[in-house]
Amino acid sequence: MEGTTVIAVRHQGRVALAGDGQVTFGNTVMKHKARKVRRLYQDRVLAGFAGSVADAFTLFEKFEAKLETYHGNLQRAAVELGKEWRTDRFLRRLEALLVVADKEHLLIISGNGEIVEPDDGIAAIGSGGPYALAAARALVAHTSMTAGEIAREAMNIAASICIYTNNNIIVEEL
């Protein structure tokens, strides 16, 4: 997924989700202050996206509806969205990834409906994801920073490497 970076960090009993603000169209930067992370379900769930903006908003709406249906149960809502994503002909064409988290779980929901919960409590998606992931793992292992501080610094490192990621970073924490 070209054009963004989103990272989620679970550390010291907290969870933080951070995303950059850059939106690109081909080789052109179209927007610098997009909001790619948001709070859902009574501010108890964090979600971020990488990929097509229109597709991501469709998935946010679907995921939020699943959260309502399953009373904020993140895992159940993710599994049900994954099932629908795999079986619905329209949804299968959507090009986006979601990273979602609550106080207990952190999940990546992929475009083919797969759901992955990382072992180390760190997940990153988008073109700058590998850089942010590596930075966050190092910061968790070698600093006493908070989850929010780690997410922000990992995003800054990714933005210094990935041309599709800027340093207009929004961090949400639970």
Curated annotation (Swiss-Prot):
**Chief location:** cytoplasm
Which residues are Na(+)-binding? A159, C162, T165
The residues annotated as the active site are T4
- Subcellular localization: Cytoplasm
- Record keywords, A-Z: Allosteric enzyme, Cytoplasm, Hydrolase, Metal-binding, Protease, Sodium, Threonine protease
Q: Which GO terms describe its cellular component?
A: HslUV protease complex; proteasome core complex
As its record notes, the protein acts as a catalyst of: ATP-dependent cleavage of peptide bonds with broad specificity
Inhibition and activation profile: Allosterically activated by HslU binding.
Could you name the domain of life of the organism this protein comes from? Answer: Bacteria
Q: Which Gene3D superfamilies does this UniProt record tie to the protein? A: Glutamine Phosphoribosylpyrophosphate, subunit 1, domain 1
Instruction: Tell me which EC number(s) this protein carries.
Output: 3.4.25.2
Annotated GO biological processes are: proteolysis involved in protein catabolic process
Q: What Gene Ontology terms describe what this protein does at the molecular function level? A: metal ion binding; threonine-type endopeptidase activity
Q: What CDD domains does the record tag this protein with?
A: protease_HslV (cd01913)
**Belongs to which family?**
Belongs to the peptidase T1B family. HslV subfamily.
| NCBIfam families named among the record's database cross-references | ATP_dep_HslV, PRK05456.1
Q: What does this protein do?
A: Protease subunit of a proteasome-like degradation complex believed to be a general protein degrading machinery.
The record's annotation in PANTHER family points to:
ATP-DEPENDENT PROTEASE SUBUNIT HSLV (PTHR32194:SF0), METALLOPROTEASE TLDD (PTHR32194)
Listed under subunit, the entry gives: A double ring-shaped homohexamer of HslV is capped on each side by a ring-shaped HslU homohexamer. The assembly of the HslU/HslV complex is dependent on binding of ATP.
List the protein's name: ATP-dependent protease subunit HslV
**What is the source species?**
Moorella thermoacetica (strain ATCC 39073 / JCM 9320)
Instruction: Print the organism lineage.
Output: Bacteria, Bacillati, Bacillota, Clostridia, Moorellales
Report which gene this protein is encoded by: hslV
